[in-house]
Amino acid sequence: MKWILFLLSFALMSVLNMAAQGRVQGSFAPLKGESRVNFDMVFMNIHGMSEADFSTYETDWQKDKPEVVGIFTNGVNRKLGNSLSVGHFPDAPYTLKVMVNSVSTKGDYLCDALLLDAQQHEIARIDALKTRGGVWGTKLNLIKQGAESAGKACGKALKAALKKAGK
């Protein structure tokens, strides 16, 4: 009986881990030899509202958003290590654009990561990165906790895509 519970637990953890990794389309090979990538983050839906509506509802959002983006990029960079740095590098030839499709009231994120060239054409993408948010706290605290786990998941998926591409 214990053996069956162990196998079921292992299978569940494997499925959850695969769900967080997303699907890779295209190749991240153009990032070979690059040390820096510009970063952009767009929030499509927060707590069932557009970002503009959420800004009206949560008046501090425009002040807090840079911190949330910083938490996300720190998570990405921690997973990437020294191989590549993601941040505000407008002169970099490539941009990693994260489209946050939704942030739930618990801080769960669903996002896509797109690699764009200098002309903003899509080269590659990682679709459907799903992560869990926070456990307790204010709405902003849950969004920040979710940004940290989403950043780590994005960094992990990006690192795997780079490894597959040979970087």
Which positions does each model-derived feature cover?
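Bacterial Sec-dependent N-terminal signal peptides
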Residues: 1-24
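C-terminal/domain-edge helix-coil "capping" segments
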Residues: 21-34, 122-167
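A structural "domain/chain start" motif
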Residues: 19-70, 160-167
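Surface-exposed short loop/turn segments
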Residues: 22-23, 79-144
